[in-house]
Amino acid sequence: SIVLGRSIDYAQMIVTAKLEGGSEADVTRMVEWTVQGEVGSVSPRGLFVPSANGKGKLTARFAGLRLEVPVEISGIGSGYVPDFVRDVNPVVTKLGCNAGTCHGSKDGREGFKLSLRGYDAIFDIRAFTDDMASRRANVAVPEKSLMLQKASASVPHEGGQVTKPGSKYYEIIRNWIGAGAKLDLKTARVESIELFPKNPVVQEI
C-alpha cells in the first residue's frame, strides 16, 4: 500500500518481470498506470505524486496482468516543517551544492564550505545558520536568505541557477528556514540501500 502524510512526499513504483531463464527485467516504463479516487497522478516512469487527501487505488497493467495498490493520502493543504536531514540536505545534494566540484570540495568555494555530499549535518547546519551573521538562512525573511538567493540566481552566483522560486526544492528550503532552520539529531537515518531488480537484464549499453 501507499500511505503518504505530507504534500512533499511521493512514492516510486517499480515493476519487475521474471523472464523464462530466471532473470528479471525492469518493465516499469512499459506499464499502464491508472489512479482511482483522484488522489494523485503517476508519471510514465512510475513516480506517484499526491494531489488531494483521501483514499484511492493505483492500478498497474502489463502483458494482460493487473495489480491494484491501495492509496491513502493526508496532509495536503496543511503546513509542514521540512526536516534538515530527511528533506533539506537531500535537496542540497540533488542541486549539487555539496559536491566535490562545488562547496563540498576540500576548501569549499568562495568562502563557503559544506561537508562532502552532506555527511556531517552539524557542520552543514552551522555553515548555513552561524556564518555570515546568519545571512545564508534568514529566519525573519526566508526569501532574503543567501541560501535561496544564490541558488535561484537572484544575486550573482558562480554556480548559476540551480532552482527557481516556487519550485518544489525552493519551497522545501524556504519552509525549513521559515520554521527556524533547525536540526533534529534524532531524525532517522538511512541504514541501507537496495537496488531492484537485483539481477537485471541489460539490453543495451
Model-found features: residue ranges?
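Aromatic- and Gly/Pro-enriched helix-to-coil junctions and flexible linker segments
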Residues: 1-205
